[in-house]
Amino acid sequence: MVGAYYVGIALLVAGGSQTAAGVDQYDLEQTPDNGFSRLLALDEMLRSRFLRKSRNPKDNLMLSEANEERTPSSPSNSLTEFIVSEPITTNVMRTE
């Protein structure tokens, strides 16, 4: 019974290899790419087009070479220091 099982497996393997060998290689080369290569070309074109520095002098966004994204040129200009007066902090603290 075990021998019949091994013979059946051997026949399935042999039949599968003949089927794989019968595939025409020309048909594999002619398969459509579903636009994948066109999408890669479009992605490269968009990346090179939109990561340029703006010619508009009012635009304060510059190209950051570290991460290749448009970022504000100086984030420290928009940050201001918030100073909390001492009486407010003492009123907030609870004493137990």
Curated annotation (Swiss-Prot):
Annotated signal sequence range: 1-22
Positions with biased composition (Polar residues): 87-96
Locations listed in the record: Secreted; Host nucleus; Host cytoplasm
Key word Transferase present: no
Motif (RxLR-dEER): 49-70
GO CC field: extracellular region; host cell cytoplasm; host cell nucleus
Keywords assigned: Host cytoplasm, Host nucleus, Secreted, Signal, Virulence
Region of interest (Disordered), residue spans: 57-96
Entry function: Secreted effector that dos not suppress the host cell death induced by cell death-inducing proteins.
Annotated family: Belongs to the RxLR effector family.
Comment text on domains: The RxLR-dEER motif acts to carry the protein into the host cell cytoplasm through binding to cell surface phosphatidylinositol-3-phosphate.
Name of the protein this chain belongs to: Secreted RxLR effector protein 123
Organism: Plasmopara viticola (Downy mildew of grapevine)
